[in-house]
């Protein structure tokens, strides 16, 4: 592990990917966001129209989430192992479309549970596969900027999907959203053809150094004995534990006395967050290469407790929506910089996507626990107590990051 980090970035030859491949990556991020967004957020409303009660809707959503958590680490390992990243993404998109079609045609219990397992399981492929292709195409030197650009197009796709599919549900039917996802899978798969496989360096794509052709990947257990990686894992889990329940709690707050308009305000919250993420993502990628990773992470972690406290200070709907700007700042920075930190810490190990998948699994578990624990606090004590509890966890995460986490941008150059 130490030796890998001492490898000078100058040993990696400069990458010169074609414009067509880079545009293909851009639009793949945009379209994948559309496909993935179309299945999740509208499912509860769709099932309610078929007289599903809250318990069964909650079970359906939980099954998909559990499938995603359980497959994150295997998906990362699979991406590291397979050379054909494009084919893997294509299979994932096709499987997701099949799940959406199953939901649209058979909105009964068992078919829908099967569809949720299929969708949750295959969705785990996309993030590590996109990161792998990006790293293999542009190399470590340009990965900061590329990851920021990926997140920008992903967030723009999320905004477009939220608006377009909301209009489809309003003007046509909720069911039409899932048919649209199926149709959207076709251009998403076709856009993969723009990405030239010859421009994806397999060794770089799995996090090895250039020139280590056929090198053996380090054991994942060795990686997780690495102190900075364990510290970052702890911080990431706490960040998502503090963050995951805030928007659902806000939704309950907005629903009080708002009637049907509560859905409109919730949509405004989502669009506000994604718009800020879109603006910040490219900036975060650029600044991560000059400022370093830690200063940006401190900003992301710092706004989270402030956001939790602000929710307790007002009941004004417009102000509550405006506070979502802080959500966009935190998510926009963390979404870009967290991947860069993992790339820094696993460089030369050949375990980039496996580690990314393992951390995403842990983060998913933390987010799930957030919903349960914060929900219990709100039920017994009230929403203000729930927000303050989450703010306290976020403050603890900030303290651990500030005092214990090293800067990772040049960590591989240090003589340890």
Identify what each model region corresponds to.
Residues 5-22, 199-232, 416:
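Juxtamembrane intracellular "pre-TM" segments in multi-pass secondary transporters
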Residues 12-65, 230-231, 235, 240-254:
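Helix-loop boundary and gating motifs at the non-cytosolic
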Residues 47-48, 78-79, 167-172, 254-255, ...:
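Interfacial helix-cap and linker-helix signal at transmembrane-aqueous boundaries
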Residues 71-84, 169, 280-292, 378:
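Helix-to-loop junctions at the C-terminal end of transmembrane segments
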Residues 87-101, 182, 295-309:
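Structural signature of the two symmetry-related core transmembrane helices
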Residues 117-154, 341:
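Cytoplasmic helix-loop-helix junction between adjacent transmembrane helices
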Residues 183-205, 397-405:
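C-terminal membrane-cytosol helix-exit motif in multi-pass small-molecule transporters
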């Amino acid at each position: 592990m130490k030796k890998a980090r001492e490898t000078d970035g100058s040993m990696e030859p400069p990458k010169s990917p074609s414009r067509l491949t880079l545009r293909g990556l851009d639009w793949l991020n945009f379209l994948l966001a559309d496909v993935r967004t179309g299945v999740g957020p509208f499912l509860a409303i769709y099932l309610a129209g078929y007289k599903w009660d809250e318990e069964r809707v909650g079970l359906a959503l939980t099954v998909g989430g559990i499938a995603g958590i359980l497959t994150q680490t295997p998906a990362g390992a699979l991406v590291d192992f397979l050379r054909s990243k494009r084919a893997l993404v294509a299979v994932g998109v096709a499987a997701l479309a099949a799940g959406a079609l199953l939901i649209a045609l058979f909105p009964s219990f068992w078919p829908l549970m099967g569809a949720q397992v299929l969708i949750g399981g295959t969705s785990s492929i996309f993030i590590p596969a996109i990161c792998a292709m990006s790293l293999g195409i542009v190399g470590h030197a340009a990965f900061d900027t590329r990851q920021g650009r990926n997140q920008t197009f992903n967030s723009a796709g999320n905004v477009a999907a939220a608006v377009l599919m909301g209009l489809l549900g309003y003007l046509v039917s909720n069911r039409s959203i899932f048919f649209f996802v199926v149709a959207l899978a076709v251009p998403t798969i076709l856009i993969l053809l723009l990405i030239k496989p010859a421009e994806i360096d397999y060794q770089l794509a799995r996090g090895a150094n250039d020139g280590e052709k056929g090198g053996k990947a380090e054991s994942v257990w060795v990686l997780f004995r690495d102190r900075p990686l364990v510290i970052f894992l702890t911080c990431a889990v706490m960040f998502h534990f503090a963050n995951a329940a805030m928007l659902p709690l806000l939704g309950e707050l907005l629903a009080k006395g708002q009637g049907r308009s509560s859905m409109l305000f919730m949509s405004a919250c989502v669009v506000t967050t994604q718009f800020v993420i879109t603006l910040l993502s490219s900036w975060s990628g650029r600044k991560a290469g000059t400022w370093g990773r830690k200063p940006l992470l401190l900003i992301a972690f710092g706004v989270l407790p402030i956001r939790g406290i602000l929710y307790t200070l007002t009941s004004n709907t417009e102000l509550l929506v405006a506070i979502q700007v802080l959500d966009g700042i935190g998510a926009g920075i963390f979404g870009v910089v967290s991947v860069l930190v993992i790339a820094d810490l696993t460089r030369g190990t050949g375990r980039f996507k496996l580690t990314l998948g393992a951390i995403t699994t842990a983060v998913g578990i933390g987010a799930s626990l957030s919903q349960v624990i914060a929900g219990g606090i709100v039920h017994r004590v009230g929403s203000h107590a729930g927000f303050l509890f989450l703010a306290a966890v976020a403050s603890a995460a900030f303290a651990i990051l500030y005092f214990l986490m090293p800067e990772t941008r040049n960590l591989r150059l240090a003589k340890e």
